[in-house]
């Protein structure tokens, strides 16, 4: 088993650095009698109080965003279009910044169960989007407020991407300058990246 990420991983790193550094890590969900996992290939950083695209812009504190003001490694799930999206809180308590997990490359041993969770979706469609990957992993709103360090969800060091590419975030129009922040990070060439064109897929993704 690869080394699990501990709270020290979040120390002395910015949210942007964390969004880059977890590319290639294995996201694991232990549920019932099986374990499902995949390698993170796409993330987005959300910079809290100063980021118009963040739920916590201007330090907005609501029932939904309350967990964003918690400690690093806390899990923030929310629903959008009947899908659950997965985020990790990144900064010290009181600073509501987070990283959204947008896409995974599933591990081989997880694919069969993931296909059942995704109602027989197969191939890249299995986990090439934030709502798809949570469904494949069996995550839900019940995971809101858990942490990566004392729950059935965790991160492990796993793969090293050949190139990490930074681009604009997806689905954040009309957010002023925040619309153009290059805060989406991908393992360049992965076929599991969301909104990917076939010509962008590469055979050389990991070191």
Curated annotation (Swiss-Prot):
One GO molecular-function entry: DNA binding
Keyword list, A-Z: DNA damage, DNA repair, Hydrolase
Transmembrane segments: none
Single GO biological process annotation from the record: base-excision repair
EC numbers on record: 3.2.2.-
Pfam family, one: Pur_DNA_glyco
Cysteine pairs bridged by disulfides in the record: none
Family the entry assigns: Belongs to the DNA glycosylase MPG family.
UniProt-recorded name of the protein: Putative 3-methyladenine DNA glycosylase
Species: Listeria innocua serovar 6a (strain ATCC BAA-680 / CLIP 11262)
């Amino acid at each position: 088993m690869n080394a699990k990420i501990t709270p020290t991983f979040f120390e002395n790193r910015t949210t942007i650095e964390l969004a880059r550094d977890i590319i290639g890590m294995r996201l694991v969900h232990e549920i019932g009698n099986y374990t499902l996992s995949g390698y993170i290939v796409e993330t987005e950083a959300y910079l809290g109080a100063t980021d118009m695209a963040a739920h916590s812009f201007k330090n907005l504190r609501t029932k939904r965003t309350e967990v964003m003001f918690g400690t690093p490694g806390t899990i923030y799930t929310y629903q959008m279009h009947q899908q659950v999206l997965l985020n990790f809180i990144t900064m010290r308590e009181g600073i509501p910044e987070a990283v959204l997990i947008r896409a995974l490359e599933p591990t081989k041993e997880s694919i069969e169960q993931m296909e059942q969770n995704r109602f027989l979706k197969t191939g890249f469609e299995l986990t090439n989007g934030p709502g798809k990957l949570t469904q494949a992993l069996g995550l839900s709103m019940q995971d809101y407020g858990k942490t990566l360090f004392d729950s059935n969800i965790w991160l492990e060091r796993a793969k090293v991407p050949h190139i990490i590419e930074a681009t604009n975030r997806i689905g954040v129009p009309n957010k002023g300058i925040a619309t153009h922040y290059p805060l989406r990070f991908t393992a360049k060439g992965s076929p599991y990246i969301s909104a990917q064109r076939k010509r962008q897929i590469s055979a050389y993704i990991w070191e």
